[in-house]
């Protein structure tokens, strides 16, 4: 998309799991659990998440996130997707902007100073589900692992970060 890096200098010939040591752009950030390889890259101080997926899935997720963003729903910002063909290997990747000041749900349990937010977890994710439903979206894999949270005036705001199973 316009206004974002082109990401052409990344080692796309390799799976994301092999990127450490292949690019200086990798950043370690606090993250949740993911069933797919995920890396974070830095371009001039802006962080981006890249998630490797089976062929075609990244395009579908990218399109769903664009639709959600157009409706101003709380989700990560889609930046682009990549279709990768290397030899017999076919895969894809989605690129999203890193959600600044966000926390994976596990952080709310691991850090004692965040304990007051634990009671707001269910309210936040329920609120997200209501917003998605009212906008006509179905989220087939709703879980805390597919959600990030931002603190908001003593409460939490939930953000969808994994749209693989949305319709």
Predicted segments with their positions:
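Conserved ATP-binding subdomain of kinase catalytic cores across diverse folds
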Residues: 6-140, 156
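Catalytic activation segment of kinase domains across protein kinase-like and atypical kinase folds
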Residues: 138, 144-167
